[in-house]
Amino acid sequence: MKEVTVQELKEKIENDDDFFLLDVREMSEYLVSNLDGEHIPLGELDARIKEIEDKKDQEVIIMCRSGNRSGRACQFLGGKGFNNVANLRGGITAWAKEIDPSIPVA
């Protein structure tokens, strides 16, 4: 599975690269802190996949709290024809630790 580090994600954001950020945490976690990505909880991804089908050929970076749920989402979307998915290594926990310590993690 392809992974992206939080430093690489930060560079993509700063460079205004063309990618799609998908946050698969629960709503309660997303409301505490987020990086402005599209929010679809992992448990709803199958039912809501039509919302993101237009991203199949775009780079999709998937995040969660630590990288476990996003890893499962990467495998799921890869099996549904998404050609360029990557897991954010360490999730928002790594972002808070390495990029922005002011971000709370739920």
Predicted segments, located by residue:
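Short, surface-exposed ligand- or partner-binding patches at beta-edge/loop junctions that are enriched
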Residues: M63
